[in-house]
């Protein structure tokens, strides 16, 4: 029994010891698995960290390479691959000014008109008339301006634009800003980023084509065509009245469009004057052109000296001018700025789905810039006088803190043009002798300047202002387009004192301590008072 007992106990103990060993082995295996799992987790985490670091490095390298590739594409590939199409003249607009300011006529250009215009232009060219209005170089020399096809390239750009920059809002806003500029400054517009198609101003052919469109606006029109009145003003336009676009009472613009009407270019005509060669004949709109030039680009109504006849009655005394009067004169319904706004609205109504660009030469370029500023659309100008002062006087909207690269107004010019550079002033200048007070030099937007004085040895001369000289001898001749950069800080008419109202106050509302009421502003189109007499020094001695 002892043996049996010992044997049973041994077997039972063995079973217990075996179970314990197995449990130990199991625990050891489980512990090993946990350690292996921890090791695998750590390795996986390290691998992910390494991948993240590598991904970040690749992203940085890719971003740098992509930025360079994008810049190359914008300057090379985009220029070749963003063809906006072939543009032709599709409409001619005439807007009356002065007593005829309610007239707005539109001529739709068709095949019959092109044929008649080509025949008349050939006669003009044969007799040497208007030969300075159309470029003479290359394939354009024998081209018919009314049938010429222009090549433009576009690119999509991000611009800053207000939601309110539409005709329904802007004109009432400008009228309100004219009467109460202090309150208008408190109106906060909803500025935001917007993608739109703009002209590719790095492409040489595009810049030349826009300059040609500006030149086309000068070319004489035949006295025929089916003009239609697009205003509510009831008038009959018959016979010789059809050629209103060429008399002294109007502003003209030519409208160009591509094949699918997705892009439309509005080219505004510039100044016609014999003293400005290459800008039209002296009897074509010259009187009102000169008046609007002196309003837009002088410090105070073209008051250069007591010998000058002013174009408005805002001058008070030596180097003192009534600012509210100047603003009212610019906003009058019979001035060119209002005519430009009406033309843009009509083009927008007839081409509602198109991207609208503006261009022009000289006065036409300045007007194109002002209209573009009003509605937040692109404009490319050529040899335009400084229009920044007019932009401020008209209270045109400017986005706060606008980055320079987002501006869509480009001014092309060269250093030998005294009008573009703002040096055509002074008693002995050609502009002053001809009665033009071109006293401004500051431009808004970007300036694209060809330094022909240093590059080509040109001398500053008014003859270099003409459009076909710019196209034939500069835009065509230079290998690359001039770089467009923001202009330096500039101030026009710094020595003038501008008072808000004629009695010297700066606010249209009377203050609490005022001893007499402040004059209220008059409606646009009429100054607050009229000077009836001045003394020898130019001081106004009697008011109407």
From Swiss-Prot:
The chain crosses the membrane at residues 46-66. The keyword Cell membrane does not apply. It is found in: Endosome, Multivesicular body membrane; Prevacuolar compartment membrane. Residues 1-45 are cytoplasmic. It comes from Eremothecium gossypii (strain ATCC 10895 / CBS 109.51 / FGSC 9923 / NRRL Y-1056). Lipase which is essential for lysis of subvacuolar cytoplasm to vacuole targeted bodies and intravacuolar autophagic bodies. Involved in the lysis of intravacuolar multivesicular body (MVB) vesicles. The intravacuolar membrane disintegration by ATG15 is critical to life span extension. One of its GO terms (cellular component) is membrane. PROSITE patterns: LIPASE_SER. Its EC number is 3.1.1.3. Residues 508-530 are annotated as: Disordered. Its main location: membrane. Binds to both phosphatidylinositol (PI) and phosphatidylinositol 3,5-bisphosphate (PIP2). It comes from the Eukaryota. Pfam families: Lipase_3. Belongs to the AB hydrolase superfamily. Lipase family. This is Putative lipase ATG15. It is a single-pass type II membrane protein. It catalyses: a triacylglycerol + H2O = a diacylglycerol + a fatty acid + H(+). It is an enzyme of class 3 (hydrolase). Glycans are attached at residues 200, 229, 234. The active site is at residue 362. The keyword Zinc-finger does not apply.
């Amino acid at each position: 029994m002892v043996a049996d007992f010992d044997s049973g106990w041994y077997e039972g103990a063995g079973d217990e010891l075996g179970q314990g060993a197995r449990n130990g082995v199991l625990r050891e295996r489980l512990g090993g698995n946990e350690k292996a799992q921890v090791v695998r987790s750590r390795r996986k985490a390290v691998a992910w960290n390494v991948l993240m670091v590598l991904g970040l490095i690749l992203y940085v390298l890719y971003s740098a390479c992509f930025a360079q590739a994008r810049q190359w594409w914008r300057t090379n590939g985009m220029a070749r691959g963003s063809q906006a199409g072939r543009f032709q003249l599709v409409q001619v607009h005439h807007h009356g000014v002065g007593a005829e300011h309610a007239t707005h006529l539109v001529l739709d250009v068709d095949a019959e008109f092109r044929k008649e215009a080509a025949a008349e232009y050939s006669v003009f060219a044969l007799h040497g008339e208007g030969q300075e209005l159309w470029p003479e170089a290359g394939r354009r020399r024998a081209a018919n301006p009314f049938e010429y096809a222009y090549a433009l390239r576009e690119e999509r750009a991000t611009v800053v634009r207000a939601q309110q920059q539409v005709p329904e809002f802007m004109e009432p806003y400008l009228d309100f800003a004219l009467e109460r500029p202090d309150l208008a400054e408190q109106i906060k517009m909803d500025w935001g980023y917007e993608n739109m198609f703009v002209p590719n101003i790095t492409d040489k052919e595009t810049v030349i084509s826009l300059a040609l469109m500006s030149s086309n606006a000068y070319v004489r029109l035949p006295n025929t065509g089916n003009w239609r009145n697009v205003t509510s003003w009831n008038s009959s336009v018959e016979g010789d009245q059809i050629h209103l676009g060429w008399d002294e009472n109007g502003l003209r613009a030519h409208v160009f469009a591509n094949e699918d009407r997705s892009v439309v270019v509005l080219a505004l005509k510039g100044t016609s004057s014999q003293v400005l060669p290459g800008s039209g004949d002296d009897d074509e709109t010259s009187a009102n052109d000169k008046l609007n030039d002196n309003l837009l680009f002088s410090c105070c109504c073209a008051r250069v000296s007591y010998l000058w006849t002013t174009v408005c009655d805002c001058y008070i005394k030596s180097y003192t001018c009534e600012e509210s009067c100047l603003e009212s004169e610019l906003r009058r319904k019979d001035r060119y700025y209002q005519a430009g706004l009406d033309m843009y609205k009509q083009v927008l109504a007839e081409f509602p789905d198109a991207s609208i660009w503006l261009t022009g030469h000289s006065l036409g370029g300045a007007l194109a810039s002002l209209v573009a500023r009003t509605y937040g659309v692109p404009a490319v100008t050529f040899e335009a006088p400084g229009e920044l002062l007019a932009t401020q006087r008209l209270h045109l909207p400017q986005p706060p803190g606008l980055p320079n690269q987002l501006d869509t107004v480009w001014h092309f010019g060269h250093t030998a043009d005294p009008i573009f550079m703002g040096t055509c002033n002074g008693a002995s200048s050609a502009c002053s002798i001809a009665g033009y007070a071109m006293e401004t030099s500051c431009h808004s937007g970007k300036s694209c300047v060809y330094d022909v004085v240093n590059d080509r040895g040109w001398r500053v001369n008014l003859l270099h202002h003409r459009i076909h000289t710019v196209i034939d001898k500069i835009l065509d001749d230079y290998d690359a387009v001039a770089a467009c950069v923001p202009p330096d800080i500039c101030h026009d008419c710094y020595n003038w004192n501008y008072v808000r109202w004629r009695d010297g106050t700066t606010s249209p509302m009377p203050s609490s301590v005022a001893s007499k009421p402040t004059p209220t502003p008059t409606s646009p189109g009429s100054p607050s008072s009229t000077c009836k007499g001045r003394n020898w020094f130019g001081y106004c001695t009697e008011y109407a």
